[in-house]
Amino acid sequence: MTKALYLDCHAGIAGDMLLSALVDLGAHPEDIESELKKLPLDQFKLHFQKRVKQGIHAMTLNIDVKESNHHRHVNDIFKMIDDSTLPERVKYRSKKIFEIIGQAEAKIHGMSFEEVHFHEVGAMDSIIDIIGGCIALEQLGINTLYCSAIPTGHGKIHIAHGIYPIPAPATAEILKGIPIAHFDVQSELTTPTGAAFAKGLVSSFGPFPSATIQHIGYGAGSKDFNFPNILRVIQFDSEFEQQDSVQVIECQIDDMTPEALGDFMNNALEQGALDAYYTPIFMKKSRPSTQLTLICKLHDKIYFEQLILQETSSLGVRSTSVNRKILNRAFKILSTQHGTVSIKFGLQNGKIMKMKPEYEDLKKMAKTTNQPFQVIHNEVLQQLYQTYRIGDILQ
């Protein structure tokens, strides 16, 4: 059994809404503030209070801060987190969210990741939202997060670089591959920080899974509308495998180069395909050929069928809806002599069925220590199997 959290983003998601909802769920604001004040930040005070939003009693957050208004680089924020005494999983989750926002800003502004100035993100309130939210998740013992489709709103927004359409450029970049919900509201409903929380920490998107609800928290946004501007978070104990349906799209291709096939696969995965792979086959006239198989969410069926017809030489596709069963997933941080690595667990009835270190973490660790990847991989696996055992209940 593992603690899981569902983010019901019917009115969007922002960092302050999530932190407020987690406090309403049961996280202790005094402990969150105490942990945050261990960081080298300007003086601040958190004020959580209840407000009524269109009949819904929800928690809100106001931050009193004396800010020096200096911009922070991503490495400044990473160093601040690394040098802190925060729990390892809080460090990992926080850095992952900042990295997602930084990568989006770097791409939009045409600069390297290290050159990114964190304007809004570097501001005190955003640092508090991100790190405070990860502290609250740790307090509540949340291992796995799920999320609904996310509405963005529409219209125009004033940001540091001028007037931009909604979703803001960084938000749109972050939300690539994430299902978007239509909500006809002329306002920004989802911020880059909220989008990065979902992108970085959520295991899967869709309707609420079959489960027994344990607790519910409500976090209110700062704007008032004719609907409840709230984020609802639902805590439940995840005991059984997930079951859902996905779309399998296939076609045969015998006249594309390997380079073109590779480019299409990369593009499809970037656009949100769950998986894509090629199988060598023989077609009529004994021609060596390739079968493309693409797996996506049901609601993405039309989009990926069109993508295949536009970007491959195929004249048609076959599409089938299939059921799938998935082990519950949970993540924990493993501390090693070379640094920390995220471990992905596959669980059934709370028992460990599968476990593996995240490849990207191992790759970074090998690069940082200047050691062969296989050496790092073997050392981490050895420590992993000394710490956890297949069949044990994940604590």
UniProtKB/Swiss-Prot annotation:
Listed A to Z, the keywords are: Lyase, Nickel
Q: Which InterPro entries match?
A: Ni_insertion
GO biological process terms, alphabetically, are:
protein maturation
Which EC class, in a word? lyase
- Quickly give the catalysed reaction: Ni(II)-pyridinium-3,5-bisthiocarboxylate mononucleotide = pyridinium-3,5-bisthiocarboxylate mononucleotide + Ni(2+)
Q: Which PANTHER family match?
A: NICKEL INSERTION PROTEIN-RELATED, PYRIDINIUM-3,5-BISTHIOCARBOXYLIC ACID MONONUCLEOTIDE NICKEL INSERTION PROTEIN
For this chain, the family text in UniProt reads: Belongs to the LarC family.
Among HAMAP family, the record links this protein to: LarC (MF_01074)
- What this chain does, per the record? Involved in the biosynthesis of a nickel-pincer cofactor ((SCS)Ni(II) pincer complex). Binds Ni(2+), and functions in nickel delivery to pyridinium-3,5-bisthiocarboxylic acid mononucleotide (P2TMN), to form the mature cofactor. Is thus probably required for the activation of nickel-pincer cofactor-dependent enzymes.
Q: What is this protein called?
A: Pyridinium-3,5-bisthiocarboxylic acid mononucleotide nickel insertion protein
